[in-house]
Amino acid sequence: MGAYKYMQEIYRKKQSDVMRFLLRIRAWQYRHLNKLHRAPRPTRPEKARRLGYKAKQGFVIYRIRIRRGGRKRPVPKGATYGKPKSHGVNQLKPTRNLQSLAEERTGRRLGGLRVLNSYWVAQDSTYKYFEVILVDIRHNVIRKSGSLNWICKHTQKHREMRGKTSAGRKHRGLGRGFHYSQTKGGSRRSCWLRHNTLSLRRKR
């Protein structure tokens, strides 16, 4: 096994003494930094490389902090209107995962860069910390690379907003087969719509 494989195995054993100490120190360090800040290099190089990161010009790593927990519905004084079924305010769970939310917030703040992917680095009782891999599409190294210039296309603008990253595809239910997550037809919505639309075909 190469060095990256050993690093991957170390990260899988998060309850070991080494990892517990390391993650605790990192969470303490990140807690004292800004909510969104640039990291000089990937904290987990083996994970970053598996997600497409290259140690070359045009690649940037940003670290972001996301508050853990459920999502409170943003309604004034709890006035939701409608039926009692939709009166919930406090104990709602977001449809999207926190990693996807981290990518979106990073993409909003850094609109000139493209979000490639992201990964978990640490967490404590209040926050989760993610590192987001971003690409500068105006850099000649990226534009001239045959394996990387696909992200320069205009169809890849704000891909994190449209569920195109790994975290986004996960919360959309893609990647595990349509039998698992009812996504036959491309998405959960299209599958639900087809099953709930009455189609009376005219006999000719």
UniProtKB/Swiss-Prot annotation:
The keyword NAD does not apply. Residues 71-91, 159-182 are annotated as: Disordered. The keyword Ribonucleoprotein applies. One of its GO terms (biological process) is cytoplasmic translation. Keywords: Ribonucleoprotein, Ribosomal protein. SMART domains: Ribosomal_L15e (SM01384). Residues 159-174 have a biased composition (Basic residues). Belongs to the eukaryotic ribosomal protein eL15 family. NCBIfam families: PRK04243.1. This is Large ribosomal subunit protein eL15.
